[in-house]
Amino acid sequence: MKSIKKIIFGLTFGSLIAGGLFAAPKASNKGKSMDVLNGKEGIFAVIDTDGGEIVLNLFYKETPMTVTNFVGLAEGTLDAAKGKPFYDGLKFHRVISKANGDGQDFMIQGGDPKGNGTGGPGYKFIDEFVDGLTFDKGGKLAMANSGANTNGSQFFITIVPTEWLNYKHTIFGEVLAGQDVVDSLKQGATMKSVKIIRQGDEAKKFSATQADFDKLQKEVAKANEEREAKKWAAVIDGCTKHSSGVYYKVLEEGKGSVCGKGKNVSVDYKGYLTDGQIFDASRGFHPQGHEPLDFKTNGGQMIPGFDMMVQEMKVGETRKMVIPPELAYGSRGIPQAGIPGGAYICFDVKLLSAK
């Protein structure tokens, strides 16, 4: 039988060989994520965090203004950064993920110098939406905001598809490497540094000065106005403008006399935003909709624009209505229904009966 001394010595020596003084040091993963950039041209951001590196491809061709803001802050070339890397040392102040102990995977958010979701660089800038850039998968880099055209320094990276955010948050990049880092970070994790890498002749010419940013803001504002004008033209195409400001178009003729005031009516309806997003409907327009809507015209039950239009309809008529905010839900909107403040809203309405 071996002595106790020999057994202890054997265990100790074996332990040292297996994982102690004589063990080879573990290889560091730091910098390994950079391998994904080999042979690639473009502008990339490398966020070094407590949990590892996140490598991002920045969409500098598709969203040049938003990328200029991000790069200018990261490199300290925008006035708000005061010559210092703005993001270095900031926290991911908001994390919603299973790794963080939440019930679902969503995203990580950072870029707030206050660290509580209320801070920014001291300015706000407009949205820069691009058709086809959507939250169809995880790993999308996008601007956080508190509503339309309120971008600053805060950004987020998604963990899963989040398509309900499409065209509400500007997407300006995506994860190339380190999605596992994104998925595993916990709230309060630090961005040790954010480094910008330019590869290729075109990317190397990309500058992010205050003058560049100011110029791009004007260009994007003009492009946004032109795009919105085209969208609006499509919304009211073929419509007549009522003296009240409501646009309408008769889609199907009715019979008899117009409904008028004080009538008990029943209507099928579909309510939607000018981008086509439906917020409410009855079964006549949607298989999962409600029962037809019953109300008394001019009885103060409905929004003014809707009531006014129904009064002018004939039984059997289907009419499209585009109602201005002052005759709909005003400056407040109905956020819980997805209706923003100050929004024009549309209805397709069929008058089923009027008594």
Name each region found by the language model.
Residues 2-8, 19-355:
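Cross-family detector of peptidyl-prolyl cis-trans isomerase
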Residues 11-17:
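Sec-dependent N-terminal signal peptides of Gram-positive bacterial secreted proteins and lipoproteins
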